[in-house]
């Protein structure tokens, strides 16, 4: 006796449905990536895999975020939120890298923007060095919720 199309398709419904659900979650809710540099060491090691949450409340100081800058995903820590003052004279700089000259040494973070730093001040290309030192809320892709093994050795 021949099986109908419905009977033949039935065993595939659950696996296909689960695959679709996982795909939707990974594309719209979660972000899986890796730490591309040593800028967040010792907190996050270069090559570690990370899990970010795309849907979250407003970032706050201390949050580790994944942001997009010039088409590249970066992992940084929020150092100042909208309205917070940033005293540039108190920040640690790497002397080999030219620092943009701002007219003021104390900047106020504009509304809808953030000032970000890497935990490894000696090896981080972050708000201290960017011509436009602030990251807009739209540039923030996800908030870090977990990191996984440092599987890629240098």
Regions from the language model: what does each represent?
Residues 1-154:
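Extended hydrophobic leader/signal-anchor segments used for secretion and membrane insertion
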């Amino acid at each position: 006796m021949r099986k109908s199309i419905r009977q033949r398709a039935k065993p595939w419904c659950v696996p296909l449905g689960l695959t679709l659900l996982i795909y939707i979650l990974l594309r719209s809710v979660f972000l899986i990536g890796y730490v591309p540099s040593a800028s967040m060491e010792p907190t996050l090691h270069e090559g570690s895999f990370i899990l970010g949450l795309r849907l979250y409340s407003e970032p706050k100081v201390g949050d580790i975020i994944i942001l997009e800058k010039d088409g590249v995903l970066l992992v940084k820590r929020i150092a100042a939120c909208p309205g917070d003052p940033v005293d540039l004279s108190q920040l640690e700089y790497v002397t080999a890298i030219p620092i943009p000259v701002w007219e003021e040494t104390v900047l106020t973070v504009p509304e809808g923007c953030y000032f970000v730093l890497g935990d490894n001040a000696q090896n981080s290309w972050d708000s201290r060095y960017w011509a436009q030192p602030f990251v807009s809320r739209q540039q923030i892709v996800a908030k870090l919720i977990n990191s996984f093994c440092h599987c890629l050795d240098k």
